[in-house]
Amino acid sequence: MKESILDVLLYLFEHYFSEDADLVRDHDSLQNGLIQAGFSPAEISKAFDWLDALSEQRPSVARPHVDGPVRIYHGPELDKLDVDCRGFLLFLEQHRILDADQRELVLDRAMALDQDELDLDDLKWVVLMVLFNQPGAEAAYAWMETQMFLDEPEPVH
């Protein structure tokens, strides 16, 4: 049986959300499909809670990118996100793929996963899911998706 929240989220994203974002509202049919795919009801419930928290934290108005102070990570964040993950978040912010609010949302959603540590690939999926859920972030989402699925990622312009 597949047992992590991230596994459930990735399955949902790859099989459902990439085709129709409105499917997230139909928890019953999604849950049945996930159970048939081998996920436990407990992990499915946690994944739905994760998605609900993501949609509740959606910013109401897109803010322009402003250069602000560097984010200082604290204990649990340092434990969960290695230097590659933290460097990647800084890279995304410096290249205006994420703004400060989106970075904080990515951090919140990464910390909400039931894993002791996240590797860079896991964090990239969290970033992709957050951007997918952000109004006005279509270009950033498209760039991030390209980074994940192409053998040779395109550079940031």
Swiss-Prot record:
Q: Which family does it belong to?
A: Belongs to the Smg family.
The name of this protein is: Protein Smg homolog
Gene name, Swiss-Prot/TrEMBL: smg
A single Pfam family it belongs to is DUF494
